[in-house]
Amino acid sequence: INQDWNYETTQFALNATAVFELTHAVLPGMIRRKTGAICNVGSAAGNIPIPNNATYVLTKAGVNAFTEALHYELKNTGVSCTLLAPGPVRDAVIPENEKSIVDKVVPDVLWTTYESCAKETLEAMAKNRRRVVPGPLSKAMNVVSSVAPTRVLSPVMGWFYKKMS
């Protein structure tokens, strides 16, 4: 509600418009050559209505649905499309004086490393998997969002995201 409009529109352009335009730019050539792989970065957060993070959720829900739909549309074309839905990703160890508010709010055990995220993603792409969810937090969010009622989950996630802002 009280978000910076410029920040929100920039976030939309980066998270949604750029994904759509870049996919559109490379896909025709891949289909013509009958080979290629697309990996779009969505989020487990795109599966849950999260107060205090509405624009992010909007963009990631769109990327999730767009990418997973393309995965099926591209069957038998030689082109694969995988959704990467990571949780928080960073270096394994961060000095205390360099930690952001997110680093301080999200416990270390819930982060995944760049290397681990990349390895899981490349393995999933090689197997033409529809979705890859690296990291403990995103795996948990993925499961919880499929079983917990929205009326319970959304307020909890909204509180958590508000702590990070």
Named regions from a protein language model:
Residues 28, 72-73:
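Alpha-helical segment proximal to the catalytic Tyr-Lys
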Residues 50-54:
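Active-site loop immediately N-terminal to the catalytic Tyr-X3-Lys motif
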Residues 1-9:
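Substrate-binding pocket helix/loop in short-chain dehydrogenase/reductase
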Residues 23, 59:
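Active-site helix of classical SDR
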Residues 43:
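Residue(s) in the substrate-gating loop at a strand-loop-helix junction
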Residues 25-34:
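A short helix-coil junction within the Rossmann-fold of NAD(P)-dependent oxidoreductases
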Residues 73-136:
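SDR active-site lid
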